[in-house]
């Protein structure tokens, strides 16, 4: 999935982008880390496919002005912006939304909560809970790695 808008600097900020990203994360998570006798197919699917549920209805279509290099004229081009209608965090928002419809296992909730790893606002603010989560729940590390690989190695990002 390539998000064709040149100004979609947020990964997955295009029609179908969230679904495509979630499927990529699932493919990486399952293909790289799944061990049939130890892991649950359902848990891997839930974590990979729903980790970014917080981004549903998160991007708003709009336009912005960009100067045309050839003509020197300003032109309106399609763009996406963030419109966070429910400012509840990122991973924690996904967990909250999922649990309105289904009960997560602790391992699933922790993996989804901390899938952003060191990019999470709580970590950047000085929280040390991430290291405890990664030590106690290996699935959290695996989901984070799968998300990174999908985002930076499989998917193309706009400028």
Model-derived features: positions:
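Divalent metal-dependent catalytic cores for phosphoryl transfer on phosphate-bearing substrates
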Residues: 10-12, 16, 20, 27, ...
């Amino acid at each position: 999935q390539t998000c064709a808008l040149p100004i979609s600097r947020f990964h997955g900020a295009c029609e179908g982008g969230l679904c495509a990203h979630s499927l990529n994360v699932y493919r990486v998570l399952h293909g790289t880390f799944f061990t049939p006798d130890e892991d649950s197919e359902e848990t891997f699917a839930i974590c990979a496919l729903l980790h970014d549920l917080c981004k549903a209805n998160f991007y708003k279509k709009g336009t912005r002005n960009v100067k045309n290099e050839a003509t020197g004229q300003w032109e309106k081009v399609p763009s996406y912006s963030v419109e966070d209608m429910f400012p509840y965090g990122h991973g924690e928002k996904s967990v909250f939304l999922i649990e309105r419809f289904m009960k997560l296992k602790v391992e699933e909730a922790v993996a989804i909560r901390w899938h952003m790893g060191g990019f999470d606002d709580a970590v950047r603010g000085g929280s040390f809970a991430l290291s405890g989560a990664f030590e106690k729940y290996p699935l959290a590390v695996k989901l984070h790695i799968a998300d990174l690989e999908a985002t930076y190695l499989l998917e193309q990002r706009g400028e």
